Amino acid sequence: MITNERIVSYLHSLEKGNGDFLDNLRVYAEANNVPIIRKEMESFLKVMIDLRKPSSILEIGTAIGYSSIFMAMSSEETCHITTIENYDKRIPVAKGNFVKAGMDERITLMEGDALDKLKELVDNKAKFDMVFIDAAKSWYMEYLMEVFKLTEPGALIISDNVLQEGELSESRYAIERRNRTIHGKMREFLYNIKNMENLDTTIIPLGDGVAMSWRKQ
């Protein structure tokens, strides 16, 4: 948590909920330690979808399908979501949730390693208006390199959990040794997206940190 918990609790109290299905799915995820987007991230995503009005969204990291369904519900009925997941135990749960939510026609789940599936999409000349990255943090830079091939100028790229509970502000020597690799790779990722000429990026201390990048060229 990188923001004051009392403030976050207050902001959560203002939310009106997402309907019984998603609200119950959140309860299930929290009870089973399944990582899903935070409530404050939901509001951010919804506003970005309302502003960008994408016709196609790519999600890297499905888990049990919560954010896929949320984005489908928040977008136009003509918008299609492609999502990638490699954890075998969560894939059938996500697929079942898509059916239960009535979103299985609007969401395509690709099973396997994210980088491999991104390259497959590149080979198939797929294009997306919006990309949501929420998978293995140490691979964000590699994902982004493939995402560039899957987007055009005007695309919106959102990367979640980029501040690592605030640890990114610490020296690598203050970080537990087992976390130093991801610490270094995420710092490299943030430096790159802030300095790339083809991106305008803002990094916001929302939830666990979110980077919003607008592709200029």
Model-derived features: positions:
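A short alpha-helical cap/connector motif
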Residues: 1-130, 137-158, 162-217
